[in-house]
Regions:
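Rossmann-fold scaffold of SDR-type NAD(P)-dependent oxidoreductases
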Residues: 17, 88-96, 134
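A glycine-rich helix->loop->beta "capping" turn
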Residues: 9, 60-61, 81-93, 101, ...
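Conserved glycine-rich cofactor-binding loop
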Residues: 20-21
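Catalytic loop of short-chain dehydrogenase/reductase
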Residues: 97-105, 128-148
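The beta1-alpha1 cofactor-binding region of Rossmann-like NAD(H)/NADP(H)-dependent oxidoreductases
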Residues: 66-77, 112-115
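Conserved glycine-rich Rossmann-like NAD(P)H-binding loop of the short-chain dehydrogenase/reductase
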Residues: 34-50
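N-terminal Rossmann-fold NAD(P) dinucleotide-binding loop
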Residues: 24-25
């Protein structure tokens, strides 16, 4: 490994929130096979470890960063970590909460405030020409049965 590789110079980084499973993990696999190094962010360290192992088994350069997107300090730490690894060229914000995952306040903190945190933390560090993509689920269109 050269000195440039050790400090991340020239390495393209794709950050994926919710990357330990589902759409996030599939996105990590796709971006990694394209040649980007991927940083997976999720709340559960054990799930992150499993996802990283699966990616590395496919010869994908992958890193884990436990992160609670509803917590500003946690998201800021994620942005710093990703930037320390190389040039952040893509952020795929896929993490989110479904209605069955908690009360309304918890869901709003994760989905709405979490999205604001991701934007605020990554806009200053993303490379020129980079992209930040937010993904949402169909639950945004489904009214809870108690409201109707």
């Amino acid at each position: 490994m050269t000195a440039m590789e050790k400090n991340g110079a020239g390495r393209k980084i794709c950050v994926i929130t919710g990357g330990s499973s589902g759409i996030g993990f599939a996105t990590a696999m796709r971006m990694g096979k394209k040649g980007d190094a991927v940083v997976l962010a999720a709340r559960t360290p054990s799930k992150l470890e499993q996802a990283i192992a699966a990616l590395k088994a496919e010869d994908i350069e992958a890193f884990a960063c436990p992160c609670d997107i509803s917590n500003w300090a946690s998201v800021k730490a994620l942005a710093r970590y990703a930037q320390s690894l190389g040039e952040v060229t893509a952020v795929m914000h896929i993490a989110g909460m479904s209605p069955h995952m908690g009360d309304a306040e918890k869901i709003m903190r994760g989905n709405a405030l979490g999205t604001v945190h991701i934007h605020d933390a990554f806009y200053p560090v993303i490379a020129d020409g980079g992209c930040l993509i937010d993904t949402s689920s169909m639950s945004a269109y489904l009214a809870p049965s108690r409201i109707m």
